């Protein structure tokens, strides 16, 4: 009951109307960066104690999730563990013939027929963005159940339509979608639970565990590239043709954690997009430290 009350309140906080006078210089800066970028970018940023976002630019526009949806898959596992203890210890059997796809550096090294617990698959799915590990979890829980957990958490415009597929197919179609605001809400709940030791989308203990896993992310080229060295960041990236995404909690153990989600689509110049992501991250972080 407490979790349900929090989830409703969290959604209300996330979409609280932002006063027109709030951080106009940051808003203008983000818009200028977006207009100069070859493609579309959406940005959502919020601290835990603000009733309004630091910035919300195209925050409710739909974007391809790419691998950022794996955060929801992880959150589903922990939410279900709270409801049905033992969920994280259930096993899934790996088949080279039916499971292995591209973008699976960890699972490609595993023996055929090996068994993994749900918890064991979460780490490579997040930290290495292993697509096969993600698909094994999606198959285990089911697309509908993952979407249900997202819906219960207030993710109104996030939809997992299918498993991850080989790169050639991803180029043709990407129908897993979300918004910067939805991804912001998801990370807000995980960080809120961890930072304030309260149950949100999952118990406080599991929120701590999710943040710790994301702290081990190996792809640090996007949002972390715009943040000063040494600042802790828990993030999850995602890439497909025309899209470079990153969703993060900046300084998750500090006094003022920042949830920042940056989604893109229609990119024609990845170097320029990377520069734009760095500029956005730098501007958002700078706005909170004076």
Feature annotation, model-predicted:
Residues 5-21:
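N-terminal export signals
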Residues 23-33, 37, 54, 140-142, ...:
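Structured C-terminal helix/loop/strand segments within mature extracytoplasmic catalytic/sensor domains
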Residues 35-62:
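Short, conserved catalytic-motif segment at the N-terminal edge
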Residues 38-40, 58-60, 66-68, 87-89, ...:
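Extracytoplasmic
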Residues 40, 114, 135-195:
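Mid-domain, small-residue-enriched loop/turn segments at the edges of structured enzyme/sensor domains
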Residues 48, 88-105, 141-142:
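Acidic helix-start/capping segments at beta-turn-to-alpha-helix junctions
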Residues 51, 63-92, 125, 260:
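Active-site SXXK
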Residues 98-135, 143, 176:
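Conserved catalytic neighborhood of penicillin-recognizing serine enzymes
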């Amino acid at each position: 009951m407490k979790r349900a009350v929090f989830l409703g309140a969290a959604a209300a906080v996330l979409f609280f109307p932002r006063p027109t006078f709030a951080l106009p210089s940051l808003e203008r800066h983000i818009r200028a960066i977006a207009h100069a970028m070859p493609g579309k970018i959406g940005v959502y940023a919020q601290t835990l104690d603000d009733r309004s976002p630091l910035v919300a630019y195209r925050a409710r526009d739909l974007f391809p999730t790419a691998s950022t949806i794996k955060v929801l898959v992880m959150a589903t596992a922990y939410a279900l563990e709270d409801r049905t203890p033992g969920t994280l210890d259930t096993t899934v059997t790996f088949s080279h013939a039916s499971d292995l796809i591209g973008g699976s550096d960890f699972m490609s090294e595993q023996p055929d027929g090996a068994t993994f617990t749900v918890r064991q698959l979460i780490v490579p799915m997040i930290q290495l963005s292993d697509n096969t590990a993600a698909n094994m979890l999606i198959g285990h829980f089911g697309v509908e159940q993952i979407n249900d957990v997202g819906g219960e958490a207030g993710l109104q415009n996030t939809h997992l339509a299918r498993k991850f597929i080989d790169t050639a197919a991803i180029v043709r179609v990407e129908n897993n979608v979300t918004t910067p605001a939805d991804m912001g809400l998801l990370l807000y709940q995980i960080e809120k639970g961890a930072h304030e030791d309260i149950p949100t989308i999952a118990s406080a203990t599991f929120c701590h565990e999710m943040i710790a896993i994301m702290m081990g992310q190996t792809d640090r080229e996007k949002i972390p590239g715009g943040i000063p060295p040494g600042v802790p960041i828990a993030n999850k990236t995602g890439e497909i043709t025309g899209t470079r995404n990153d969703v993060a909690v900046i300084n998750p153990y500090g006094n003022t954690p920042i949830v920042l989600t940056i989604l893109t689509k229609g990119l024609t110049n990845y170097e320029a997009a990377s520069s734009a992501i760095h500029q956005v991250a730098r501007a958002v972080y700078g706005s909170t430290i004076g």
